[in-house]
Amino acid sequence: MHIHSYQHRAGLNCETTCMRNVLAVHGVEFSEEVLLGLDGGFGFGYFERRDNGPDIVIGRQQIFSGQALRLLGVRARSFQGSGAAILLDQMKLERPVIARVDLSELPYWNSHGGAPFGGYFINLVGHADGQFTVSDSGFSQLQTISEDALNRARTSKRSPPINPERWCHVIESVCGTPDLGRVGYFAVENCVRDVLKPSIGNLGLPGLKQFAAGVRNWSRTKTGTVKMQLWTDGGVHDVSALACQLQSLGRAIEVFGTGGGLFRPMWSRFLHTFGDLVGDERLLDAAQAMSSSAHLWTMLGRNLLEVGPDSGQATLEQQLEALIDAIDRIYQLERKAMDGLRSIRPLATRVPLAAAHLNTTSNFA
C-alpha cells in the first residue's frame, strides 16, 4: 500500500514540512514560513535538568497546535493510539498520517538512542511487509521503519515533558480561500501575547530570561561527566557535562529541525512576507529585529557545534562567556520585536482584501 498522490520533499522543519507536503496532496501549496507563522507556536522554551545532563531548549511554545490549518480552512483530525492498525485505517483512505515520534527512536537516523526528543514529526505514506514508508523532512529520500520500531518511537517516554504520547494527525479536506491579511494579524497577535505572557515561566521571554540565568550557572551545575553519543563515530562516550551541554545546545539550535537559528530565520521571513503583503511597517520592523536575532542564534549554534569531547576547560569557559553575552543581546532584540507587535491590529488603510488573498503561490511559496 502506498499513497501515490504524495510527493516527498525534504524541508526546514519537521512539523511545517509535514503539513506542507500533506496539503500538497490536496492541491494546495503553502511555504513552511507561512505555516510556521500562522500556527502561532513560535517562541522559546527552556527546561532545566535536575541532574548534570543537558538542559532542553526549544524554539517553539506549542507543538502541532493546528491553528495554521484552522486559519487556512483545513479540516483536520487528531487522535491517539498505539499499534499499526489505527494508522493503517487512515492510510487506506489515501490519507498520509502525520505521526509524532521520539527522534532518537528512529533507526534510520542512526542516533542509537542518543538525544531523545519527543516533539518530532514524520509522515507515514506507505506500508508493506510489516514496514512503514516514512517521509522525513531531514532526508532527500523516503525511509522505512518496522511496525515495532515505529511503535517504540510513538510511545517513548524518554524526553519528558516533551513525549510523543502516540499523537497522530490527518488532513481530511481543504476548503475556502484564506486571506492572509486577516488571519495573519490574528496569528501574530496570538503568538506575541503567548511569548510576552506565556502560561508557564519556562516559555516565551520569561523562559529566555530563565535560560540566561541557567546558563550563568552551568559552570557549577554542569560538572563531572555524562554519556553522550558522538557524531564522529556514532558511539556513546563519557564526556564533560559542560561540553555535552554546549554541543547539545548547538544541535538544538542548528540541527534538530529548526530551519537553523532556532526558527528565528523562518519567523522573520514570515513577518517580512506578511508585512510586504499588507504594507505594514510595524511587521517589517519586527522582521528586521528578528533577523538580527536569527543571525546571533545561527552563529551561536555553529560555534557550539565545534565543541568536542577533547575541548579543554579554558575553551569551554570561553564558549560559555560568549553564550552569556549572545543571549543578553538576543533578549533585547526579541523584546524589541515583540513590544513592537504588542496588540497589533490591521492598519486602517491597507491593501485591498482581494490583493491579500493567498490564492496564488507567488504570495507565499
Model-derived regions, located:
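Short, charge-rich amphipathic segments
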Residues: M1-H8, T16-A24, F47-G59, F121, ...
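Residues that form generic nucleotide/phosphate-binding pockets
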Residues: V25, L71, Q90, A153, ...
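Noncatalytic regulatory segments and standalone regulatory/sensor domains
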Residues: D129-F256
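Charged, long alpha-helical assembly modules
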Residues: A243-A365
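Conserved active-site-adjacent core of cysteine acyl-enzyme catalytic domains
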Residues: M1-G27, L38-G176, R345
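Short helix-capping/linker segments at secondary-structure and domain boundaries
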Residues: A24-E33, L271-V278
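Short alpha-helical "patches" and their helix-cap loops
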Residues: S31-F42, E281-Q288
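Exposed alpha-helical structural elements
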Residues: C18, I63-Q67, I86, A149, ...
